[in-house]
From Swiss-Prot:
Its main location: plastid. Keywords: Chloroplast, Plastid, Ribonucleoprotein, Ribosomal protein, RNA-binding, rRNA-binding. It comes from Chara vulgaris. InterPro entries: Ribosomal_bL20, RIBOSOMAL_L20_CS, Ribosomal_protein_bL20_C. This is Large ribosomal subunit protein bL20c. Belongs to the bacterial ribosomal protein bL20 family. It is found in: Plastid, Chloroplast.
Amino acid sequence: MTRVKRGYVARKRRRSILCQRAGSRGAHSILFRNAQQQNMKAMIYSHEHRKKRKRDFRSLWVTRINAAVREQGLSYNKFIFLLKTHKVLLNRKMLAQIAILDITSFKKLLLVIN
């Protein structure tokens, strides 16, 4: 029988996957097959949540703006409409930061667009 000389490559591949699963508990960090399946699942989750993070932050900004605007007696929808008609170039992230950190500036902005 001839000698197979590819053992190192297979070992390297398995070791790299087991190293990726180093923080896991139980068989997921010890057994190669379980570790490989768990690694695939983890990569799927990380991809999904990278996309989901953007949606989550946008909804957080909208909620913060809505809370700040309602204190001044205006709805979020009306506020965004007024911003667009007055050609104010602040995005929702900036508006949320202003609403939280600098309330006086936010009130001045409301006076400008009303």
